[in-house]
Amino acid sequence: IIVAHNFGDISSNSNQIDTLPSLSSKVKSILKIKNPKCVAYDIICGCPGWVEGVIQAKSFIKSGMATKCLIIGCDTLSRVSDSNDRDSMIYADGSGAIILESNDSTSSGILSHNSATYTFDGENDFLYYGASCTPEISKNSNQKYIKMHGRKVYEFALNNVPNAMKDCFDESKCKIENLKKIFIHQANKKMDEAIIKRFYRLYKVPQPENILPMNIEEYGNSSVATIPTLFDLVKKSDYKGHKLNTGDIIMFASVGAGMNINA
């Protein structure tokens, strides 16, 4: 059991994170799983945490260390957001999960992946935990809130995510025209659209229509939960004209605190 989160377990009347015991251990207990060989651990990797959990699960299965993995992405950003900070407007709560298991099929599975962490030039401070924007609150309270340097995050994402996506897709040996959907972390609609435009520009091909499902307008930015919840919406039904068929080649891509990127 892999639980990816940043602020996944916070009571409704506090913004203090409860990490002892781990959230994954709590999930295992609630599911009443008796087998001690079912290992449970948390990942804190910023918004890319759930995708990183999927990558790790794939490695466990491929190596023979596991046959089935539950990967959960969950966050409660509403409880660590500063209501006086305009960056807090799109923060949301959410959770999503998948189960990966081994099989002998050659027509399904994870074809390739790519992960990176940038810290050398101060990228680790682009998103951080800080005091409220309101002086009266910050002066009289020790509470911290999620904060970010929005412009730096935006520029970092546009400069680095398209190349990371290309590295991942090139490793799959697939043709770019066969890519059916891109599920990208729902951080900012304008930023996501710009990332995808730059990604296709790297291949010198026009961006296909209907390649990029988006749900940030309805669900907001729920951090690690955005990709699994969006994937679920599209997989279950014809969501805003987006649907999936067996055998479709899709891509997950995310960027977030760290700064971390994966695809």
Please give the residue ranges for each predicted region.
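Short glycine-rich phosphate-binding loop at a beta-alpha junction
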Residues: 1-4, 175-185
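Short beta-strand segments
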Residues: 3-4, 44, 69-75, 100, ...
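Glycine-rich beta-alpha junction loops
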Residues: 7, 75-76, 103-104, 114-121, ...
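Claisen-condensing/thiolase-fold acyl-transfer catalytic domains that form or cleave C-C bonds
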Residues: 10-17, 21, 43-62, 158, ...
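Acidic-glycine-rich active-site phosphate/pyrophosphate-binding loop
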Residues: 18-34, 71-76, 135-137, 192-208
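Solvent-exposed alpha-helices and their adjacent loops that cap or buttress functional pockets
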Residues: 33-35, 61-64, 88-92, 103, ...
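Flexible, glycine-rich active-site loops centered on histidine and acidic residues
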Residues: 62-95
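Condensing-enzyme catalytic core mediating Claisen C-C bond formation in acyl metabolism
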Residues: 84-159, 163, 255, 263
